[in-house]
């Protein structure tokens, strides 16, 4: 037979219930589903892929190219010495998240490219996982549709990944004064200007957001 555990009684003879243990476990971040378009929706304007009103570059990189980059970072870290931290942040572009699924798999998987690149770097180099941070916010405005860059918001999320890796405290978004400029058309429109598909980009411009720090800083 098992031994029964008797709960203690208080002065009134009532059985005391042990208090619930407090948990400080952080809430898990919900990763949005990727709504990848069908390959039949893709149009080509030179080396640019246009799906709907979004233009994207689909990069490819051979192992030798990736190894060459990692070798350069390794050499830089060695030249700077042990007293200087070398930090590498390699990031995907919008094609990794918003292109048809077959365009970011296999040799076109930017996640695989980044992972391989980091694996070729010396152990002394601090590598930043900006990919996962961006992936968690793909339902937000983190990449332009008419430009090959990330938006200011996308850059902010990569900055928070950098801070987490480097041991810094990221400045929260609500600590900035924000504003917006409308009707921005970027580099992808310029790259496709000689193709009829570029009109779609011109008719559906992006917007620019800016973030000004509320706190005044001084540098010498």
Locate each region found by the language model.
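Extracellular glycan-modifying ectodomains
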Residues: 1-220
